[in-house]
Amino acid sequence: SVKSEVDNFDKHLKAESAPFNNE
């Protein structure tokens, strides 16, 4: 569903930005 796709996209986005935020 679109909801799950958006959730997955958001999770990937947070996972990718986490290292940058931690520095």
Curated annotation (Swiss-Prot):
Keywords from the UniProt entry: Lipid transport, Lipid-binding, Secreted, Transport
Subcellular location: Secreted
GO cellular component: extracellular space
Biased composition (Basic and acidic residues): 1-15
KW Manganese (keyword) present: no
Gene Ontology biological-process annotations: lipid transport
Gene Ontology terms for molecular function: lipid binding
Signal peptide residue numbers: none
Stretches for region Disordered: 1-23
Expressed in which tissues: Expressed in hemolymph.
Superkingdom of origin organism: Eukaryota
Record function comment: Constitutes the major component of lipophorin, which mediates transport for various types of lipids in hemolymph. Acts by forming lipoprotein particles that bind lipoproteins and lipids.
Protein name: Apolipophorin-1
